[in-house]
């Protein structure tokens, strides 16, 4: 983080990833997300994140849609509120 601006270097999506917002928590390790391309997908929370990173409605996440089933995606990263605000001010998400 730079001292004068307060800007942090954040994880940005790779070629097959995109930003999404959690719309609904369906229980277990599944959430409904609204992706940056306008699609609603079923997001799967992987085991490495399940108990360490709590994902709630309204959270900004990074998802990777499945190649063989486009209506589903894996959640790869959850951004904190400060990180999500930085992404909004820089114009990466709406």
UniProtKB/Swiss-Prot annotation:
Against Pfam families, the record matches this protein to:
eIF-1a
Keyword Protein biosynthesis, does the record have it?
Answer: yes
Is Protein biosynthesis given among the entry's keywords? yes
Domain (S1-like) spans 6-80
Keyword annotations of the record:
Initiation factor, Protein biosynthesis
What SUPFAM superfamilies does the record tag this protein with?
Answer: Nucleic acid-binding proteins
| Gene Ontology molecular functions | RNA binding; translation initiation factor activity
Q: Which InterPro entries match?
A: NA-bd_OB-fold (IPR012340), RNA-binding_domain_S1_IF1 (IPR006196), TIF_eIF-1A (IPR001253), TIF_eIF-1A_CS (IPR018104)
User: Which CDD domains does this entry report, sorted A to Z?
Assistant: S1_IF1A
Sequence similarity:
Belongs to the eIF-1A family.
- What task does this protein carry out? Seems to be required for maximal rate of protein biosynthesis. Enhances ribosome dissociation into subunits and stabilizes the binding of the initiator Met-tRNA(I) to 40 S ribosomal subunits.
What NCBIfam families does this protein map onto? PRK04012.1-2, PRK04012.1-3, PRK04012.1-5
Protein name in the entry: Translation initiation factor 1A 2
Q: What is the species listed in this Swiss-Prot or TrEMBL entry?
A: Haloquadratum walsbyi (strain DSM 16790 / HBSQ001)
């Amino acid at each position: 983080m730079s001292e004068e601006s307060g800007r942090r270097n954040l994880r940005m999506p790779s070629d097959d990833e995109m930003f999404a917002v959690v719309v609904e928590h369906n229980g277990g390790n599944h959430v409904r997300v609204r992706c940056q391309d306008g699609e609603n997908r079923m997001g799967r929370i992987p085991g490495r994140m399940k108990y360490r990173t709590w994902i709630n409605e309204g959270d900004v996440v990074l998802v990777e849609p499945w190649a063989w089933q486009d209506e589903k995606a894996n959640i790869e990263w959850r951004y904190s509120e400060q990180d999500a605000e930085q992404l909004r001010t820089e114009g990466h998400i709406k």
